[in-house]
């Protein structure tokens, strides 16, 4: 049969005690659901069919004690095949198996195994032996179980080693990340400190500039009166004004000399009888007489004479 359901309805009719014979049934697939409904069928014969694979849920038929899968086209067994922990007898004669799943090591109750006529891996083929009789098949079961346990242990060690490598790599990544984050924090901290210092300097510079600006008007106000009061004495008179005073002084001096000369001539020489000299002498006498009666002049003359 090419479909699992074509004969699924009469599986119970094939059940003989605890044995269910589905050999030579032209099966391409295993009727797992129907088999799961027959937990009494602890002995299952699926030999001489066209099975190339077993579904993963086949491993849920944990009630199986004896299983015949010989003369099919099986290329591999499910990864969870070791779940069939009650299996004691397993016939895999004449299939296309190269290796067995690691979980095979869990079949602790397996007592009989036939792996003849399979393209097994050379190491596994050497362990399995020839399986030519009952004794060799029992030895095959024992040796293959021991071999698969060793393979399982090796794989577990390899898995643990990979996990350790991954953990170490993760630790290194975490340490690297932490170092990177610490470096970034330190960089941010330094940048923040530099920014704070820059702002402080700007603030101090602004305060200093403000103080200078406040001092500058005071200096100007303090210096302004000094410049006004002190500049006048130092300021030289215009040259033109100096020249005028010099000329005026010269003229006055010349006039005084002329007056004095004329006065001397009129009083000493023989010209004193002349009308002009008579007038000059009269003016001089009146002036001297008036000055003598002046109170201030008298006080000055007395003071001078006392000294």
UniProtKB/Swiss-Prot annotation:
List of residues that carry N6-acetyllysine: 135
UniProt name for this protein: Leucine-rich repeat-containing protein 59
Ranges of compositional bias, category Basic residues: 229-242
Regions that span the bilayer: 245-265
Function statement: Required for nuclear import of FGF1, but not that of FGF2. Might regulate nuclear import of exogenous FGF1 by facilitating interaction with the nuclear import machinery and by transporting cytosolic FGF1 to, and possibly through, the nuclear pores.
Pfam families named in the record: LRR_1 (PF00560), LRR_8 (PF13855)
UniProt repeat feature LRR, residue ranges: 10-31, 40-62, 63-84, 86-107, 109-128
Lineage: Eukaryota, Metazoa, Chordata, Craniata, Vertebrata
Main location: membrane
Ranges in coiled-coil conformation: 148-216
Gene Ontology cellular component annotations, sorted alphabetically: cytoplasm; endoplasmic reticulum membrane; mitochondrial nucleoid; nuclear envelope
Residue list for modification N-acetylthreonine: 2
Cytoplasmic side: 2-244
SMART domains recorded: LRR_TYP
Gene Ontology biological-process annotations: intracellular signal transduction
Membrane topology, record value: Single-pass type II membrane protein
Residue numbers carrying N-acetylmethionine: 1
């Amino acid at each position: 049969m090419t479909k699992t359901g074509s004969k699924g309805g009469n599986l119970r009719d094939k059940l003989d005690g605890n044995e269910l014979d589905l050999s030579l049934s032209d099966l391409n697939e295993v009727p797992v659901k129907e088999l799961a409904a027959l937990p009494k069928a602890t002995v299952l014969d699926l030999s001489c069919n066209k099975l190339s694979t077993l579904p993963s849920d086949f491993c849920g038929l944990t009630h199986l004690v004896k299983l015949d899968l010989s003369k099919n086209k099986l290329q591999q067994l499910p990864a969870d095949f070791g779940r069939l922990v009650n299996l004691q007898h397993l016939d895999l004669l004449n299939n296309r198996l190269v290796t067995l799943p690691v979980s095979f090591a869990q079949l602790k109750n397996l007592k009989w195994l036939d792996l003849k006529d399979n393209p097994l891996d050379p190491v596994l083929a050497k362990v399995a032996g020839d399986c030519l009789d009952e004794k060799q098949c029992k030895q095959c079961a024992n040796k293959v179980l021991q071999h698969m346990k060793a393979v399982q242990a090796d794989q577990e060690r390899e898995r643990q080693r990979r996990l350790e490598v991954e953990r170490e790599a993760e630790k290194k990544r975490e340490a690297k990340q932490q170092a990177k984050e610490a470096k970034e924090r330190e960089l941010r901290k330094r940048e923040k400190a530099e920014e704070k210092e820059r702002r402080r300097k700007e603030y101090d510079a602004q305060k200093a500039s403000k103080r200078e600006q406040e001092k500058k008007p005071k200096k100007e106000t303090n210096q302004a009166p000094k410049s006004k009061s002190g500049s006048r004495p130092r300021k030289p008179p215009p040259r033109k004004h100096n020249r005028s005073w010099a000329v005026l002084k010269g003229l006055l001096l010349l006039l005084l000399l002329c007056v004095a000369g004329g006065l001397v001539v009129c009083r000493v020489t023989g010209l004193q009888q002349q009308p002009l000299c008579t007038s000059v002498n009269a003016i001089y006498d009146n002036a001297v007489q008036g000055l003598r009666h002046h109170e201030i002049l008298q006080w000055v003359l007395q003071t001078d004479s006392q000294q």
